[in-house]
C-alpha cells in the first residue's frame, strides 16, 4: 500500500482561541510554499488538522520538507481507505505484514467520529486485532509500549490508518506574529537570529547591504543561499539588496577610523528602518550578541540605536558563540556562513574600533554627511528578489553563471 496523505497536527495553534483559523490558514499557506516544488501535492485544512494529499508524490521527500516547518506539532503518513469492515481488515493485514519481523509487538487503537459506523471503537479493535493474528499467527499483542501502534480513525468521509508519529518543529506559523526586517550579513549570527524569529511566527524579509566592487558577487550569492536555507521553516522570503558603496566610501573619507563601524551601523539601521516603514513591517531583527565585537557593547548599541525608535529584536544577544554555532549547524547555515567572502561590515573594519563611542562625537562626525540624501538614494536603489524553497541547485555552478 502507498500512503495517500500526510496528516499534520497543529502545535500551539490549539491555544489561540478566536484567532485559531487565521493561524491555521497561515500554516496552510506556508506548507504550500514549502511544497511548491511538488506540483501534484494539494493541501487542505480543518480546525483540527491539515491534510497534505500526496497524489503520487514521494512521501519521504514530502515529510522531510514538512519537518522543519514552524507551527507543526507532528506528522503522520496516512493510508486513506473506504470505511467498510472488509476493506479495513484487508488494509490492516497488508500493513502489518509489511512491518512484521520476529518478536514484533503491536496494538490496534481505533476511534470514530462517525458514530453511524457499524462497529464501535472497542469492537473495531477486537475485529482488526483478530485479523492481524489470522495473517500473522506468531505476532504478539502488547497494550503498553508496543513496537507498532496501528491507529484507525473512522471519519465521515473515509477511514484513515497510520502507524508513524513524526515530531514536527513546533513554534508558530511564520507570519502569525507579524513581519520584521532581518539585517542579514553573511556571518553565522544573523541567520540564527532569523531562524529564532521565524520560530515565534515572525515573517522576515532579509535586508543585505552590498558594496561592489569591495564586496564580491560571491558575498551576495552567499547571503541569498543563507536566505534560501531559512525558507525551509515557513516558505518564501523577500531578499532586499541595498546598494551601500557610496555610503561606505563617504564614511571612509570623512570620519575618524575608530568611528567607522559605529557610523556604518547607524546608516544601516536608518536604511533598514526606512525600508521597514515602506514595506509595513513592525520590527527590526539582527544578530547582535553582547560583547562579541566592538559594535556590540552596550555603549555601542546605545549609540547605534539612537537613530530609531523602532523595536529591535536581538534573539542571540545573550548566547555564547558556541551556542550560536550549534544552532547554525542544526539549521544547516554554518557551512555557508564560513565561506570566505567578505561582507560590507568587514571590508573597512578598523584595527582599533571604538567600543565606547560617545553619542555627541558620533553626531558631530555625522554632521559632515548629507545623511538624508545618502539614505534616500540607498532606499531608492534597493533590489527585491523572492527566494523560494525550491529543490536546490549547485551554488558554485550558479555563481559561475552569474560571473559570466
Curated annotation (Swiss-Prot):
CDD domains: PPase_ThiI, THUMP_ThiI
Localization (cell): Cytoplasm
Identification of the protein by name: Probable tRNA sulfurtransferase
UniProt record similarity statement: Belongs to the ThiI family.
GO BP term, pick one: thiamine diphosphate biosynthetic process
Residues given in the record as ATP binding sites: 183-184, 208-209, 265, 287, 296
Stored PROSITE patterns: THUMP
Protein origin, superkingdom: Bacteria
SUPFAM superfamilies xrefs: Adenine nucleotide alpha hydrolases-like, THUMP domain-like
Record gene name: thiI
Entry's EC annotation: 2.8.1.4
Annotated Gene Ontology cellular component terms: cytosol
Catalytic activity: [ThiI sulfur-carrier protein]-S-sulfanyl-L-cysteine + a uridine in tRNA + 2 reduced [2Fe-2S]-[ferredoxin] + ATP + H(+) = [ThiI sulfur-carrier protein]-L-cysteine + a 4-thiouridine in tRNA + 2 oxidized [2Fe-2S]-[ferredoxin] + AMP + diphosphate; [ThiS sulfur-carrier protein]-C-terminal Gly-Gly-AMP + S-sulfanyl-L-cysteinyl-[cysteine desulfurase] + AH2 = [ThiS sulfur-carrier protein]-C-terminal-Gly-aminoethanethioate + L-cysteinyl-[cysteine desulfurase] + A + AMP + 2 H(+)
Known function: Catalyzes the ATP-dependent transfer of a sulfur to tRNA to produce 4-thiouridine in position 8 of tRNAs, which functions as a near-UV photosensor. Also catalyzes the transfer of sulfur to the sulfur carrier protein ThiS, forming ThiS-thiocarboxylate. This is a step in the synthesis of thiazole, in the thiamine biosynthesis pathway. The sulfur is donated as persulfide by IscS.
Alphabetical UniProt keywords: ATP-binding, Cytoplasm, Nucleotide-binding, RNA-binding, Thiamine biosynthesis, Transferase, tRNA-binding
Keyword Electron transport among record annotations: no
Entry GO MF terms: ATP binding; CCA tRNA nucleotidyltransferase activity; tRNA binding; tRNA-uracil-4 sulfurtransferase activity
Domain THUMP span(s) in chain numbering: 60-165
Biological or metabolic pathway of the protein: Cofactor biosynthesis; thiamine diphosphate biosynthesis
Predominant location: cytoplasm
Amino acid at each position: 500500500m502507498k500512503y495517500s496523505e500526510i496528516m499534520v497536527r497543529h502545535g500551539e495553534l490549539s491555544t489561540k482561541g478566536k484567532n485559531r483559523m487565521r493561524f491555521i490558514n497561515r500554516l496552510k499557506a506556508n506548507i504550500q510554499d514549502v511544497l511548491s516544488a511538488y506540483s501534484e501535492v494539494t493541501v487542505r485544512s480543518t480546525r483540527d488538522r491539515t491534510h497534505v494529499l500526496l497524489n503520487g508524490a514521494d512521501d519521504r521527500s514530502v515529510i522531510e520538507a514538512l519537518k522543519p516547518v514552524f507551527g507543526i506539532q507532528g506528522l503522520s503518513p496516512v493510508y486513506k481507505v473506504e470505511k467498510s469492515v472488509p476493506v479495513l481488515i484487508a488494509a490492516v493485514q497488508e500493513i502489518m505484514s509489511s512491518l512484521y519481523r520476529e518478536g514484533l509487538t503491536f496494538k490496534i487503537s481505533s476511534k470514530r467520529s462517525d458514530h453511524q459506523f457499524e462497529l464501535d471503537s472497542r469492537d473495531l479493535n477486537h475485529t482488526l486485532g483478530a485479523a492481524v493474528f489470522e495473517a500473522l499467527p506468531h505476532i504478539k499483542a502488547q497494550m503498553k509500549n508496543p513496537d507498532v501502534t496501528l491507529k484507525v480513525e473512522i471519519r465521515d468521509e473515509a477511514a484513515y490508518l497510520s502507524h508513524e508519529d513524526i515530531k514536527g518543529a513546533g513554534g508558530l506559523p511564520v507570519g502569525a506574529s507579524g513581519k520584521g526586517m532581518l539585517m542579514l550579513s553573511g556571518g553565522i549570527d544573523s541567520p540564527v537570529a532569523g531562524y529564532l524569529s521565524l520560530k515565534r511566527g515572525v515573517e522576515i524579509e532579509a535586508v543585505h547591504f552590498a558594496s561592489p566592487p569591495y564586496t564580491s558577487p560571491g558575498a551576495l550569492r552567499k547571503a541569498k543561499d543563507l536566505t534560501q536555507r531559512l525558507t525551509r521553516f515557513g516558505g518564501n522570503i523577500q531578499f532586499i539588496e541595498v546598494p551601500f558603496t557610496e555610503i561606505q566610501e563617504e564614511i571612509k573619507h570623512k570620519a575618524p577610523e575608530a568611528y567607522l563601524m559605529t557610523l556604518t551601523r547607524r546608516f544601516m539601521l536608518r536604511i533598514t528602518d526606512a525600508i521597514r516603514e515602506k514595506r509595513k513591517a513592525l520590527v527590526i531583527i539582527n544578530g547582535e550578541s553582547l560583547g562579541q565585537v566592538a559594535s556590540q557593547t552596550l555603549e555601542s548599541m546605545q549609540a547605534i540605536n539612537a537613530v530609531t525608535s523602532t523595536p529591535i529584536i536581538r534573539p542571540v544577544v545573550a548566547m555564547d558563540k558556541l551556542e550560536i554555532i550549534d544552532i547554525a549547524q542544526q539549521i544547516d547555515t554554518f557551512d555557508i556562513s564560513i565561506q570566505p567572502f567578505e561582507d560590507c561590515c568587514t571590508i573597512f573594519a578598523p584595527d582599533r574600533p571604538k567600543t565606547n563611542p560617545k553619542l555627541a562625537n558620533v553626531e558631530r562626525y555625522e554632521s559632515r554627511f548629507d545623511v538624508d540624501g545618502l539614505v534616500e538614494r540607498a532606499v531608492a536603489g534597493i533590489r527585491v528578489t523572492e527566494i523560494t524553497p525550491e529543490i536546490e541547485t549547485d551554488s558554485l555552478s550558479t555563481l559561475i553563471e552569474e560571473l559570466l
